[in-house]
Design a protein with these regions (language model features):
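Non-catalytic interface/linker regions that flank or bridge core catalytic/transmembrane domains
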Residues: 1-31, 38-40, 44-376
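Divalent metal-coordination and catalytic microenvironments
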Residues: 6, 352, 389, 452, ...
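Alpha-helical phosphate/pyrophosphate-handling elements in metalloenzyme active cores
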Residues: 8-22, 26-30, 170-183, 377-408, ...
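Generic recognition of well-ordered alpha-helical segments
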Residues: 166, 197-198, 388, 430, ...
Length: 511
């Protein structure tokens, strides 16, 4: 609606500016950038290009267009060029090229405008593939500067990884020949609606061109965006941010295929093959009859440091069954094998989660998916925090007698945060059911329950008690009951703190 109203306004300004001009038909106004995409937010820049065919007094005409816009307090991005200059610049300047691939005519000579738009599109198709490497590098640079939309307490809706700029870049990349499935395109459209809606609401609330959704603005933006709560808003933003980042990561991988890929299938696990640098499911496998296949696939991908082939991932999403109670024999060992791959397991877990596969293994996972932790200590959503804790714990397994229980404890230590009540008490109660379902013995289940129950004990003791007091040491040992649990808890505390944020762990706390 805002773009339509702006079109009418600009058309009226243009008509007034060219009134009485003999060469009025030699000019056209193009909307470019976000305005061209019809994605104006209330305080967005207005990006306009005036194209003319050798109109001598074009500067005077341009001034008659620009000044009313400035007088209205609108921030204007503007340029005046000939058709030749415009097309030439499309071939040498990435910003111009991307701005024009979604340009549209606002007022003036429609044929001239169409000529420019078609010329820019043709230039992009010819050179776009060359631009993609630079475009991708810009995305990586933004990630370093602006972080990830899904996991920041105060995300940058436009420039953060998984934000609007990534969606735009993928749209441009598709025009240059990058392959993106119809389903991925539909998903991006839905994600765009969520992010753009939040951005528009943020502009309305702050009355300025804000891109970072600050903590104090999240409640009002949630109300304007018609979410039930600020938590619901941030969960939705985290969900779409993850989706966009994952689709983008999959798409950009086309630019850099594995150097050592081979078309010859290599069996890496029962029913699992490495082909062309990706993990595939053998064609003759009946996925519905093999519940643990998804973990074998995931572990193979993490171990090799490669992706799961998209068609194989889709097959898993379509046919993988909900796991029974109890789990199939050996299933918990398969889960532990994946978790012990550490950091390499995270992108694989994300791929499984994008196809709703984790909830078929653990239905309790659903409430923690993309659940925000809206305090200054936590850098991640609950689910990503759990994964990162597991990855950190996998680096510490040399310190403990039971690496399997360490990574299981890491995965479940905050599982209660998805449910009402004290998250520790809820988590203890939940794992009393989950452990036996996994096939853990009573003794092992009790150890993991102790880790969940006391996962804050050592950190709290280090900051609130006198560590030189024998009574403190006695209190801790009495609560834990064994050196096995103490050693596991020590490693879990470090892994958990490092996954929480930079302020949650220090050499002093370690001591």
């Amino acid at each position: 609606a805002l773009s339509i109203a702006t079109d009418t306004w600009i058309s009226e300004i243009f008509a007034s500016a060219i009134a009485g001009e003999k060469k009025a038909d030699d000019m056209v106004i193009l909307a470019v950038g976000g305005y061209g995409r019809r994605e104006l937010a209330p305080h967005s820049d207005l990006d306009i290009l005036l194209v003319h065919k050798s109109v001598k007094n074009v500067s005077d005409i341009a001034s008659k267009i620009w000044y009313p816009i400035w007088d209205a307090g609108v921030k204007l991005g503007h340029a005046v060029r000939t058709p030749k200059e415009t097309i030439q610049l499309c071939g040498t300047d990435l910003d111009t090229a991307t701005a024009l691939v979604t340009a549209r005519v606002i007022a003036g000579n429609q044929s001239l405008g169409t000529e420019i738009i078609n010329g820019a599109a043709e230039s992009w198709r010819k050179r776009g593939r060359e631009w993609l490497v630079e475009l991708h590098q810009r995305i990586l640079d933004r990630y370093v500067k602006d972080g990830e939309v899904a996991f920041l307490l105060e995300p940058n809706l436009k420039e953060g990884l998984g934000g609007l700029r990534d969606i735009h870049a993928l749209q441009w990349a598709v025009m240059a020949g990058l392959d993106l499935s119809a389903d991925d395109r539909r998903q991006l459209e839905l994600c765009n609606e969520v992010l753009l809606g939040a951005r528009v609401a943020l502009h309305r609330h702050t009355a300025r061109a804000s891109e970072i959704l600050r903590l104090e603005d999240q409640g009002p933006v949630a109300v304007l965006s018609r979410y039930a709560s600020d938590d619901a808003l941030m969960a939705a933003i985290a969900e779409v941010g993850r989706k966009v980042a994952w689709i983008a990561d999959e798409a950009w991988a086309q630019l850099d295929p594995p150097a050592d890929r081979s078309p010859i299938p290599q069996l890496v696990a029962p029913g699992v093959q490495l082909i062309d640098g990706e993990i595939h499911i053998a064609e003759d496998i009946d996925i519905a009859e093999d519940p643990t296949l998804l973990l074998r696939v995931a572990t193979a991908a993490a171990r090799a440091g490669v992706r799961i082939d998209r068609s194989s991932l889709d097959r898993l999403g379509d046919a993988s069954p909900v796991w029974p109670d109890p789990w199939p024999a050996g299933a918990s060992d398969d889960l532990v094998a994946l978790l012990l791959e550490g950091q390499a397991a995270i992108p694989v877990l994300e791929a499984l989660d994008q196809r709703n596969l984790l909830v078929r293994v653990l239905p309790e996972w659903a409430p923690v998916r993309s659940k925000p932790q809206r305090n200054a200590f936590h850098r991640y959503t609950v689910d990503r925090h759990l994964w990162q804790t597991v990855a950190n714990a996998a680096e510490l397994v040399h310190r403990v007698l039971r690496p399997d229980l360490l990574v299981i404890g890491a995965l479940f230590h905050d599982i209660g945060k998805g449910y009402p009540g004290d998250h520790t008490e809820v988590g203890v109660e939940m794992f009393a059911t989950i452990g036996p379902r996994m096939g853990l013995s009573d003794a092992d289940t009790a150890v993991v329950i102790s880790l969940i129950e006391h996962h804050l004990l050592l950190a709290d003791t280090a900051t609130r008690r006198d560590l030189s007091d024998d009574a403190t040491i006695t209190m801790v040992t009495n609560k834990l009951g064994s050196t096995l649990v103490l050693d596991l808890l020590h490693a879990l505390t470090q892994a958990d703190s490092l996954a929480t944020g930079p302020s949650a762990w220090s050499e002093w706390k370690a001591e």
